[in-house]
Amino acid sequence: MAVRATVSRFPIDSDAQEASGLPWGLTVTPFAAKDENGIGPACGSNGHLLPRCENCYAYFNTYCELDQWAWNCSLCGTLNGLPSDAIARYSNPHSIPEMTSSFIDLEMPLDGSEEEMTQARPVYVAAIDISSSEEFLELTKSALLAALEALSPGALFGLVTFSHKIGLYDVQGPIPVVKNVFIPPDGESSLSLELEDVMPLLQFLAPVETCKDRIAAALETLRPITSWERSAGAGQGMDSVLMGGRGFGTAMEALFNYLGSEFGNTFALARVFAFLSGPPDYGRGQLDTSRYGEQYASKRVDADRALLPEQTPFYKDLATIAVQSGVCVDLFAVTNEYTDLASLKFLSIESGGSLFLYSSTDDSTLPQDMFRMLNRPYAFNCVLRLRTSTEFKPGNSFGHFFPDPQYENLQHIICCDSYATYAYDFEFADNTGFSRHSGEQPVVQIAFQYTVVVPPEGLSNSEMSSSSRGKHTLQRRLRIRTMQFGTAHNINEIYDSVDHEVVLSLLVHKVILASLEDGVREGRALLHDWLVILTAQYNDAFNLVQYKNGNKSMSSQIDITFSQCPQLEPLPRLVFALLRNPLLRFHEEGVHPDYRIYLQCLFSVLDPSSLHCGIYPALMSYSTPDTLAYPRHSLSRAALITSGSPIFFLDAYTTLIVFYSSTADPSIPFPPPQDCLLRQTINKVKQERSITPKLVFIRGGRDDATVFENYLIEEQDVDGNGFASAMGFVSFLDDISQRVTEYMK
């Protein structure tokens, strides 16, 4: 569980917090195996015996004062009696995790019988859009073949297709059999019969270890639905060709109800991989894609505002059904046409899944993403709870979870991998703030309760017999991290303790929220105003602006680069980069609304360092493929020219670019050889990433370098009005300086 705060020394009261101009909060990556310093938890069992405070329900931890019979809660100060079993346990503190570490992970007893525990097999279902092209199906097949290699023995796999009909595959016999049920074309009607009546669920879900070859054979039989079949299926004459026929909404609704019948019996979590080649345009949940088009210019509608909200609550409601059925949906959209991910995204993010967007089948990383996603551990049925000491409390929470309807500051996460990150901001409980004199310090406690599927121990794949293949066990665990923070006695101490990457994380969450509610322009304005106010507060705090005749002097005195405070120095550059990011660029600059939604979903789950890389890419230079020249350059053409290095490596999180300058010595091998330092760096980056970044090699002077040059944002105008020499970031700072002057008058 990695936790990072915007400031490691908290403001003493609300006045100090407001005067700093900084967001106050933290990010947490609950299922990360280690903390932010690379240290793992102290592990143990009997999590249900961990003492809890009678007043605030916080868990006992190393910061609590303990005597023989009682303990003081480190969060609220309440004196709690110790039960007799705890007194006996704590007499030998060295063997007890909660006595030795403030970061613990304890096993919990499971509800239900031992039999139910061992029958919970991992279930995976691939739902494939066959109202698509051959290329789309070939890509999907290769992705699923990769997925089959990553699935653990004992897993069950189902294959379903959708178009104007739903196709269920039985792959447990000698040849694959498909049974179809037609989807009513209108947006109101449900299927004429339940999928369970078409094919019993346990006939549909096949054991992977015995049916892998037959699943692969079934995938090879997939063909795109023809326009003739669509028109015939829709009951139309042969001469009328019905375009469309992608009954995604009806298919998903039927599939969740189908799987839900065995939730808690055959499986504890079913993961559905939905492959979509375009917008749903048939049956329930069909989407009107005409809202994306030229008419926005003539209707004077703000496209940046109009295309961000969902046009129907259907998929949000469907996500609720998925959760109730124990289903988590990962949505893979492979399309360059407008698909309205603004409406579809809820199906994945609210059911605990991920949203992937690939604009073409040619260079798609879909197979690698599938394999990577299934190969990493995940927790499910998770509950996340943040508690604080009494002087302050959590304000807003951000991330892909849904709040508990009954309890405050309790979030449910359906499925959580080791990368998923959530954020909170804080506010003071009253005007008192923290005590300036007592030794008590602010405390934050994060509790994360989760379930994992543990495969049978000591059995290799080849040893798996049919009798043992189902013996996966569920394990319920409780992970707790308790942290104590210092308080800042003045604004310098706040500024000296800033973590700019976490500040960026909270800013990104807030501007995404603002742009969803009020449009991209409002999100940009919020960010701009924030930087102006922060710069003004900083100049005021350090007394950098002199007063003459009662008025503040010229803006030339204003320090807009935070030269007195190294921790704040990166922020203007990060804000500029965020304003240049497709997340906040204008529709008329050619930012596809689906790509914007994809970035919102991706950036909402990234840890602070990854997000920093996505907003302001890392650019380093090499003098040879084996020699690093400089570890960090600014994103400007000037930096390239002045460095004199022949090779540059740019890491933009989703894209990696190796650029050879036009003046590079022809004897330097291109592309870089596999055993060189640069390749090792690339491979390490790819290995540690949650998604598969696209790798591009470019030779300056020979290849089209546009994709690389687009990342050199510092000469670009912040509002996207083209390029100008010596403008961009410099003129942005001038503008901020003028606004700060006006603000401080």
Swiss-Prot record:
Residues 53-76 are annotated as: Zinc finger-like. This is Protein transport protein SEC23 D. It is found in: Cytoplasmic vesicle, COPII-coated vesicle membrane; Endoplasmic reticulum membrane; Membrane. It is a peripheral membrane protein. InterPro entries: Sec23/24_helical_dom, Sec23/24_helical_dom_sf, Sec23/24_trunk_dom, SEC23_SEC24_subfamily, vWFA_dom_sf, Znf_Sec23_Sec24, Znf_Sec23_Sec24_sf. Disruption phenotype: Despite normal fertility, impaired pollen coat exine pattern formation with reduced sporopollenin levels. Plants lacking both SEC23A and SEC23D are semi-sterile and exhibit developmental defects in pollen (especially at the late uninucleate stage) and tapetal cells, including defective exine and intine, as well as signs of cell degeneration and structural abnormalities in organelles of the male gametophytes. Signal peptide: none annotated. GO terms for molecular function: zinc ion binding.
